[in-house]
Amino acid sequence: MNILEYAPIACQSWQVTVVGAGNVGRTLAQRLVQQNVANVVLLDIVPGLPQGIALDLMAAQSVEEYDSKIIGTNEYEATAGSDVVVITAGLPRRPGMSRDDLLGKNANIVAQGAREALRYSPNAILIVVTNPLDVMTYLAWKVTGLPSQRVMGMAGVLDSARLKAFIAMKLGACPSDINTLVLGGHGDLMLPLPRYCTVSGVPITELIPPQTIEELVERTRNGGAEIAALLQTGTAYYAPASSAAVMVESILRNQSRILPAATYLDGAYGLKDIFLGVPCRLGCRGVEDILEVQLTPEEKAALHLSAEAVRLNIDVALAMVSDG
């Protein structure tokens, strides 16, 4: 065979659009292409920014020998035909800010980004990363009109990962041997569940004193604020990007992994018409199943309190977009 005449057969090639080329967006793009999860279109409104990042990552390709491609663009038309859209655009919080403080600043950014991206990729699955996470996910669902199973928010994977990291550091254990579960909104009222946390199958309640467990739980709730205070000029982005990448991979490769995500609830856990962090099965259709874990009356009350905090901000966000 003459090698010059060889024409490869066209194969399935996934495409992910990442809206926002800030720290989280660019790191997510890097994770996806370096792990050969998908080709990436990185979009940002700043001229030259996504193009420069994409060029740098394509140069890295020759060093690390991954196959996925990335392009940078300022135009939504270039994102057409994406299988997954991830919204990371928005202002990050600064030291002393809560995630809810970002509501007014990010509502219109998320609404516009979701509308435009889905206009060119109407069959895509939508993942929201922008804070305040649960509210922004609900908002993106409303403005796009997508089926609820095709919209989700990245928070539970991140919150559970932070709790896992703190347990690993406390016990000197391997993080991959640890399983954790955090429910609720991505904020101060999130609900870590220590009794569902294990190390190689052993409940952490048998390994760590109750007071220390409570300290780890509280540190998990404040994990993002702790990092923002240390960085002073920014907030976390490595772990958020890795968490979003895990969700994208489970969807595109139809892995059906059970991961905690901000998911639309229509009766599960006694909650309706809200996006909140719960364990769910992620596959090629998006959220394929919601798992209801057994909660004590106290845990259920705490979950509903977290939901009410999210619900209060949903109406505010919808009004902001409507007024805009």
UniProtKB/Swiss-Prot annotation:
The EC category is oxidoreductase
State the EC number(s): 1.1.1.37
A molecular function annotated in GO for this UniProt entry is:
L-malate dehydrogenase (NAD+) activity
Residues that hold NAD(+) according to the record: 20-25, 44, 106, 129-131
Catalysis: reaction(s): (S)-malate + NAD(+) = oxaloacetate + NADH + H(+)
* GO process annotations (BP): carboxylic acid metabolic process; tricarboxylic acid cycle
Task: Give the binding site residues for substrate.
Answer: 93, 99, 131, 162
Q: Which NCBIfam families match?
A: MalateDH_bact (TIGR01763), PRK06223.1 (NF004863)
Q: What is this protein called?
A: Malate dehydrogenase
Q: State the organism named in the record.
A: Synechocystis sp. (strain ATCC 27184 / PCC 6803 / Kazusa)
